[in-house]
Amino acid sequence: MDITKNNFAEQIDNITKNLKRSCFVGLDAEFTAILSGDGFKHRLFDTNKERYDLIKNEVSKMIMTQVGLTMFQYEREFDNYAAIGYTFHLCPQALADIDQSFIFQASTLKFLCKHNFDFNKFIYDGIPYLSRHEEKIIRQMIHDKTLNSNLIQKMEIEDEKKLQQCCSEVSRWLTSGEGETLYFDIESPVLRYIIHNEIRLRFPDVLTTDSLGNSNKVLIYRDKYVEGANSAPMAVLEDNLMNNILGFSQIINLLVEHKKPIIGHNLFLDVVLLHSQFIGPLPKYYSAFKKNVNNLFPIIFDTKYISHEMGKKLSYDELWNSNKLQDLYEFFSEGKCKKLEKGINFIKLSTPFNVKQSYHEAGWDSYCSGYCFIRLGHWAACETSGSYRPVGPKEKLAALDFYCNKINVIRGAVPYMNLVSDDPPSHRPTLLHIKSMKERMINIAKISSVIESSGSVDIKRYGNRTALIAAGTRNT
């Protein structure tokens, strides 16, 4: 189901209910940029700390434009799963001293167009959000009673005209003595907040509140003697404003509050962006970044890493084509896994998708990640018990616990990022040190051409006459 700013408020109660009922949540995201070029090339030399240090400044300029969440609910009576999928369309906002910015790479635009990304939903209908750091700034302004004046200073001309128009109309209405109430229909929650404040400031005797049944309406009573007159407490107006500007961050807060296991595929960049976009600026130290993420999201599974490790148990004839998400999903959904011939759960998706056109759509990919997790968990649980039979979600989670909080690392010195402990030691062969015996400056290009047929290797200069070679496997 597509969620935009137009239906977010009416759907948030259903989303909350479905999240609470879920046993785990699939997650996927689409970004405004990808880390490409020689400066961000994945190298076999890289430790996770080095890779984090390399990308953190660039990632801070990127945002998630779509977040897919699929809530998997276990129906014990039928031993089935109901999967409720959502695609949240996000858009940054400018508010007071906060002006969220980002980069869009041409290559990413091309990729998104190829996969039918809806830019109108992103720009016109995207849900706002705030990081926890930004939320703290706004709440401090509220506490200091400086938010309203700050918002007025940053108002666009059209909103400024609307504010003056409303205040002038209130003045004329009070002078004329006509009617006991007046109301304005104001779509923008920020402008609505400003109008409440300004009318109360300029006309101390009037009372203002949100009109019952229509939160877009500012209802004004001539004075406290009007029958039924009431004035919304400032705390209520502030809460209404915060709920609107927090937007999608309310969903992030629900994930944090309920501590549901989060399932994704190849999550390294997703996790870094989760911090940058919804927690706050990426910390200087890699260890602090891992601690922050784990404090808020204590249970994360990466099906890319799980499938890489469990795939080692399959023969060549049994193995999937690759463990890219599409290949892995089709391997399981088409019944190709010989380890899962009995007792597998039926998974019922509530949201229709055109499968062949939906990959790289965040909602669909979040479903695929959760689907693969269920199948991998069933396989692992049955392997542990020695028999293939029905397996519930708790048993699946327990069977895959070894892989919990281990985030796949592409082409690095170590296979995964450990969010709860030290990263593992390098699993690559010992580095090969070579030295030029004749030339005063070692020729890296020449070395590359000589060994390129040997397999997966990386080379880096190590002084004028020496270089280091990293191999992907001991068979290289």
Name each model-derived stretch.
Residues 1-476:
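DEDD superfamily 3′-5′ metal-dependent exonuclease/proofreading module
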